[in-house]
Amino acid sequence: QRQMCIRDRTYTDKISRNGLRVGDILHNFEQKYAEAKARHEQILKGLNYEYDLTEIEKAWMEGIEYLKQFPLVDSEHEINNLLNDNKSVLCEGAQGTMLDIDFGSYPFVTSSNTICAGACTGLGVAPNKIGEVYGIFKAYCTRVGAGPFPTELFDKTGDQICTLGHEFGSVTGRKRRCGWIDLVALKYAIMVDGVTKLIMMKSDVLDSFETIKACVASVSY
């Protein structure tokens, strides 16, 4: 929960145009950092939140000094130059379509765009540079934390999927919510992502099940 609050606060700074950017470490960084720190301390004061930044701030400043040894570039130019030279660019993202800040199951979403178009807005890559879009999905559904989950299983079947699929959080070890595949959500993801090819994973998890169910329609109330 604490990690989520910190991440959300960082995105808030970005949208409010108050965030620190990598390029800032080369120009008046101390002043910009002090101003940002003062803003956040005012927020924490209003929440009556006790904190001690000494150790965290020390480690963070060491990280800033470490970054200074590397050349800084405008990533959008760097990536597009590589693409223009017919080079391959591997971009790493996280989280699925339904956690997208704009098109996911709001408000139970993350703070960024997780759909395919997020690669364009996040990297400065034009939409016409994207060719095939591979949609990767599990043979069943999982979810971490709160939010709608129409096919969630609360019985031993859900526990069995969780155990066989090793569905536990990679960081916290928290058990993931498990359920049957939601084809309505999958069809929606295909639409907003512009998927051209589908790849199903973890189908072997369901090998021992005599019956496999799927959600094929939903009703809004």
PLM features per residue range, with description:
Residues 24-66:
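N-terminal leader/propeptide and maturation segments of large enzyme subunits in energy/redox metabolism
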Residues 24-31, 101, 105-134:
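Gly/Ser/Thr-rich active-site loops/lids in small-molecule metabolic enzymes
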Residues 2-6:
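Short, small-residue-biased leader/transition segments that mark boundaries at the very start
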Residues 61, 68-115, 123:
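Acidic catalytic cores of enzymes that act on phosphate-bearing nucleotides/polynucleotides
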Residues 120-221:
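A glycine- and small/hydrophobic-rich beta-loop-beta segment
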Residues 15-19, 100-104, 109-111, 144-149, ...:
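Short acidic, glycine/serine/threonine-rich loops at helix termini
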Residues 7-14:
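Internal, well-ordered alpha/beta segment that forms a basic, Gly-enriched binding/recognition surface
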Residues 45-59, 70-76, 127-133, 144-152, ...:
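Flexible, glycine/charged-enriched surface loops at secondary-structure junctions
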